[in-house]
């Protein structure tokens, strides 16, 4: 993928939501909620303070993260549906 986010932005791929319930019912696409969990694909270098000093990113490519339901901007890059969001939109890293 030939895309690198700038500054404190992060490129995230949502995890796939389940197609069936535990009881075996198939969930149609119109009834599915978009998951607020994803994997960091790439991230920028970080934000800068007024002094010009770089603030390092807390996340890195490969991290599994949780983010707000309405976070980010949906984009399609190389046929993949991804989200671009600021690092501050990420709520935490799953381990």
Curated annotation (Swiss-Prot):
PROSITE patterns reported in the protein's UniProt record: CHAPERONINS_CPN10
Gene3D superfamilies with a match to the protein in the record: GroES chaperonin (2.30.33.40)
SMART domains: Cpn10
A Pfam family annotated for this UniProt entry: Cpn10
Keywords, sorted A to Z: Chaperone, Cytoplasm, Stress response
N-terminal signal peptide: none
CDD domains named in the record: cpn10 (cd00320)
GO CC field: cytoplasm
Induction: By heat shock.
UniProt cross-references to PANTHER family, sorted A to Z: 10 KDA HEAT SHOCK PROTEIN, CO-CHAPERONIN GROES
Subunit (UniProt): Heptamer of 7 subunits arranged in a ring. Interacts with the chaperonin GroEL.
Function summary: Together with the chaperonin GroEL, plays an essential role in assisting protein folding. The GroEL-GroES system forms a nano-cage that allows encapsulation of the non-native substrate proteins and provides a physical environment optimized to promote and accelerate protein folding. GroES binds to the apical surface of the GroEL ring, thereby capping the opening of the GroEL channel.
Membership in a protein family: Belongs to the GroES chaperonin family.
The name this protein goes by in its record: Co-chaperonin GroES
């Amino acid at each position: 993928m030939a895309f690198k986010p700038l500054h404190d932005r992060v490129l995230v791929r949502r995890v796939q939501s389940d197609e069936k319930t535990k009881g075996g019912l198939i969930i149609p696409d119109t009834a599915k909620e978009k998951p607020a969990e994803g994997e960091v694909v790439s991230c920028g270098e970080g934000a800068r303070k007024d002094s010009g000093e770089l603030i390092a990113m807390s996340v890195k490519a490969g991290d599994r993260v949780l983010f707000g339901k309405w976070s980010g901007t949906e984009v399609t890059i190389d046929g993949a549906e991804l989200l671009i969001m600021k690092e501050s939109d990420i709520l935490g890293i799953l381990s």
